[in-house]
Amino acid sequence: AFAGVLADADIKAALAGCAAADSFNYKTFFKFFAIIDQDHSGFIEEEELKLFLQTFSAGARALSDAETKAFLAAGDSDGDGKIGFVALVKA
């Protein structure tokens, strides 16, 4: 699913980081969600998605309205206009 989205080297590095049994840390995934969920509502809303790149680097650009809406549509499985943790996992 990430092939073509992430560089092969990045995918390999991520997989190598959790190759050993019991090395996957689900808390890291929760931290990722919490970082993007700036208002700690338990959901990632449109404005938080717009600033998604800036969670990685303060100098990064904001996503365009079209990019933000496409991102939201891809992750909003129940059509409520926001992405919950369960929806993110299912996306």
Curated annotation (Swiss-Prot):
Ca(2+) 2 binds at residues 76, 78, 80. Residues 24-59, 63-91 form the EF-hand domain. SMART domains: EFh. The keyword Repeat applies. GO terms for cellular component: cytoplasm. Ca(2+) 1 binds at residues 37, 39, 41, 43, 45, 48. InterPro entries: EF-hand-dom_pair, EF_Hand_1_Ca_BS, EF_hand_dom, Parvalbumin. Keywords: Acetylation, Allergen, Calcium, Metal-binding, Muscle protein, Repeat. It holds the Pfam family EF-hand_7. GO terms for molecular function: calcium ion binding. The modification N-acetylalanine is found at residue 1. Belongs to the parvalbumin family. In muscle, parvalbumin is thought to be involved in relaxation after contraction. It binds two calcium ions. Is regarded as an important allergen. This is Parvalbumin beta 4.
